[in-house]
Structures are given as C-alpha cells and as structure tokens.
Amino acid sequence: AEVEYGAQLIQDFTYFNRSFMLGSALIQLYNTGTDYQTTGVFDANCFSLGVKVTVGTHSAFLAGDINNFTGVEDELASQVGSVDFLKMGHHGCPGSNTAAYLDALSPLYVFQTGKYSMLPTQTAQSLANMGSRYASTDDVCADGLDAYVVTLSATGVTSNFDYSKPRVYYSEEAGAYRCYQGGLPNASFTGWIRGDGGWLWFDCSS
C-alpha cells in the first residue's frame, strides 16, 4: 500500500496519530504503548491493539487478544468508555474480560471468537447482569452465516444474527449446560433443545 498507493506507514503511535477517520467512522487505537520492547512481557497478546469504532453516538470496541495479565484492561476501563458492541478480548479465555472492565464498557452486544465452554462463569454472569446480548463464532457457523455482521449507524446498532432462537451452551467451569434466548440466559425456558452432545431437556432452568 505504501509503494502502490503512497499510503503512510505508521509504526510509532502518539496521542495525535492514533485516531483517524475512515469514511464516516472515527477509528481510535488503544494499547499502543511500546514499553514491552524494553521491559518484556510473557506473551505477545499483552500488547495486542484494541480498536474503537464510532459512528455518530454509537460505538464498538474490537479488543483483539487483549487480556489483563499486565493490567491492560484496568487501564482501558477508564479510557474507552461505554460502547454498544464489544468483540471480547482473547477469545473469551480466562484472564481477559474482567468484571470491572466489562462494567465500564457496558456493551449492549458481545461477540466471542471462541467457544462458550471456555468462558469463565464470572464473565458469563457479568454479561448477564448487564443484559449484554451474547453470540459466538459457533453460533454463526451453526446458523450457516458467512460472518457475524454488526452495523453502526446514526440511528442505532443492528446485527445479521438471529437472537430469538433458543441456544444451549456447555460451561466447562460450571460443568453444566445453559440455555440462552434473546442472547441472554433464559431461566424460564422449558422444552427439548439440541446441544453438541444430543437433545437436552430444560424445565424452567438455564
């Protein structure tokens, strides 16, 4: 791009060059520090970039592989602000998406690029308490969608995902299946529902 189109290649970020417009969207880059080059970190995920996309008054935060092992989420909690949509950090694995961080961002929608089974119970509970509507890559594949698409506009946030369907997830930490509907745990669901391990019966339980 630099050679063919004359695009400027920026590798050193400052407060002044980490934000730019892309069409009608404001793009803001987070976790751009370079301390890891001198102090070292145990994993490259610790310096994963986060990207906030804002259109009008609506926004999304794409958290890449960000985690909180070095306190990155603690810092972002006071920097990013509330968002409409959150792509969860580090595939939803333990050590990421901490309760205080999620509470600060308070997303209406969350998407996990990983399996629900690896999602810590505390994370799932934090999302449920906030009313954040959940979906994952497994759901997208099961529905035969090419991709999960979230659209930000001046009028609001929409998605191509069908949240109305009841869905069942298995939590390794809890050792139990959970039923979701509308992107949230549904404690009143009663009936048969098919999961990875076969058909399951729920009787007013999630």
Segments (PLM) and residue ranges:
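Core dinuclear metal-dependent hydrolase active-site scaffold
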Residues: 12-82, 147-165
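A short, compositionally biased
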Residues: 14-16, 143-146, 173-174, 205
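A mature extracytoplasmic/lumenal domain signature
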Residues: 31-33, 64-66, 116, 184, ...
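Short, polar loop/linker segments at the starts of domains and inter-domain junctions
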Residues: 38-44, 99-102, 188-190
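Cap/insert and terminal regions of metallo-dependent hydrolase folds
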Residues: 71-146
